[in-house]
């Protein structure tokens, strides 16, 4: 299907500053209504008024560029158990019939002590970050800005979860259990080299092949290069999402769709870097409490067969391991 920037696809820009100033005001209710409309139509919206400083954002982009410029053997040593550290180029694919994704990544999160039983049992995303040697990439140029940005994004994520909770009829504490127990919240730096034009034309090479996000909520910061496309489920068109330096692209993932019985959407999207230069993005994922069971929110507190309901960890392991094992056919 062709790529379009004009479509009925609903991708609003929502300024949340009125909600932050007074969540009970008329202006805040308009914000809540706009977010609800986005959640029920496409699951995508652009977030403005978030309070994350441009200087902090740029420091993370600069850190990413420095890391990905390191020699391959150095990057490859920055790997750890629990989906932390370096993700090599072309190591992942979400689709059959295409080449492996033309991207590399670096994943960080909250450091969990090595003597924690969850680390010893190698539970999903439980472990230590895998930083590059400080003599090759000083902490001031990489680790510190990443850690500062991570804390800022964690706070913003709680705001977004509270805002989504306000769009639902289950009260302000509906996600409290979801957020407990050191929730898995991966921060992923991504580098997309320019894609070879012939392979792009054949539909064989993408930076990130078509997929829905696995978790509950995604907060995406794009650089000034285009590449993100979302599929209109009604027409099949791919809709380009132009970069906006002031906005985060927020989208709901499969978990949120699941617990709302599909009322809130998790849309298919992809990345193709057809620019002549490298593209970078920084993505914060809220995957949640590993032991949380993904039951419908309208059944919370009622009788429900818990044994037949996947936990967050079971869901994430199933989806994540699959994407690293797909082969081109």
UniProtKB/Swiss-Prot annotation:
Belongs to the iron/ascorbate-dependent oxidoreductase family. Fe cation binds at residues 211, 213, 269. Disruption phenotype: Leads to complete absence of citrinin production and the accumulation of a keto-aldehyde intermediate at the same retention time which is distinguishable by its UV and mass spectra. Non-reducing polyketide synthase; part of the gene cluster that mediates the biosynthesis of the mycotoxin citrinin, a hepato-nephrotoxic compound to humans due to inhibition of respiration complex III. The pathway begins with the synthesis of a keto-aldehyde intermediate by the citrinin PKS (pksCT also named citS) from successive condensations of 4 malonyl-CoA units, presumably with a simple acetyl-CoA starter unit. Release of the keto-aldehyde intermediate is consistent with the presence of the C-terminal reductive release domain. Induction: Expression is stimulated under green light conditions. Keywords: Dioxygenase, Iron, Metal-binding, Oxidoreductase. SUPFAM superfamilies: Clavaminate synthase-like. The keyword Oxidoreductase applies. Transmembrane segments: none annotated. 2-oxoglutarate binds at residue 279. GO terms for molecular function: dioxygenase activity; metal ion binding. Pfam families: 2OG-FeII_Oxy, DIOX_N. Its EC number is 1.14.-.-. It comes from the Eukaryota. Gene3D superfamilies: B-lactam Antibiotic, Isopenicillin N Synthase, Chain. The gene is citB. Its cofactor is Fe(2+). Pathway: Mycotoxin biosynthesis. Residues 183-288 form the Fe2OG dioxygenase domain. One of its GO terms (biological process) is small molecule biosynthetic process. This is 2-oxoglutarate-dependent dioxygenase citB. Binds 1 Fe(2+) ion per subunit. InterPro entries: DIOX_N, IPNS-like_FE2OG_OXY, IPNS-like_sf, Iron_ascorbate_oxido_reductase, Oxoglu/Fe-dep_dioxygenase_dom.
């Amino acid at each position: 299907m062709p790529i379009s920037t004009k479509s009925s696809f609903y991708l609003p820009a929502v300024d949340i500053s009125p909600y932050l100033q007074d969540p009970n005001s008329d202006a805040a209710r308009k914000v809540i209504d706009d977010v609800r409309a986005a959640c029920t139509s496409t699951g995508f919206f652009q977030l403005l008024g978030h309070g994350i400083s441009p200087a902090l954002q740029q420091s993370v982009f600069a850190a990413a560029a420095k890391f990905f410029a390191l020699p391959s053997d150095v990057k490859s040593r920055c790997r750890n158990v629990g989906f932390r550290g370096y993700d090599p180029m072309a190591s992942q694919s979400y689709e059959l019939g295409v080449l492996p994704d033309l991207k590399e990544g670096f994943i960080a999160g909250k450091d969990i002590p090595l003597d924690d039983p969850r680390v010893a049992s190698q539970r999903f995303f439980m472990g230590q970050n895998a930083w590059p040697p400080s003599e090759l990439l000083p902490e001031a140029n990489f680790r510190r800005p990443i850690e500062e940005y991570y804390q800022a994004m964690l706070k913003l994520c709680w705001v977004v979860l509270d805002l989504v909770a306000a769009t639902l009829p289950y009260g302000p504490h509906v996600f409290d259990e979801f957020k407990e127990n050191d929730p898995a919240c991966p921060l992923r730096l991504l580098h997309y080299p320019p894609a070879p034009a012939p392979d792009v034309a054949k539909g064989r090479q993408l930076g990130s092949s078509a997929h829905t996000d696995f978790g509950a909520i995604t907060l995406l910061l794009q650089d000034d290069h285009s590449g993100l496309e979302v599929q209109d489920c009604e027409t099949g068109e791919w809709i380009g999402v132009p970069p906006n330096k002031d906005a985060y692209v927020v989208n709901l993932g499969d978990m949120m769709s699941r617990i709302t019985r599909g009322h809130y959407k998790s849309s298919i999207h992809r990345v193709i870097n057809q620019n002549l230069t490298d593209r970078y993005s920084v993505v914060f994922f809220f995957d949640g409490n590993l032991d949380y069971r993904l039951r419908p929110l309208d059944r919370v507190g009622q009788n429900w067969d818990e044994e037949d309901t996947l936990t967050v960890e079971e869901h994430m392991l199933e989806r994540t391991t699959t994407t690293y094992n797909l082969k081109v056919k």
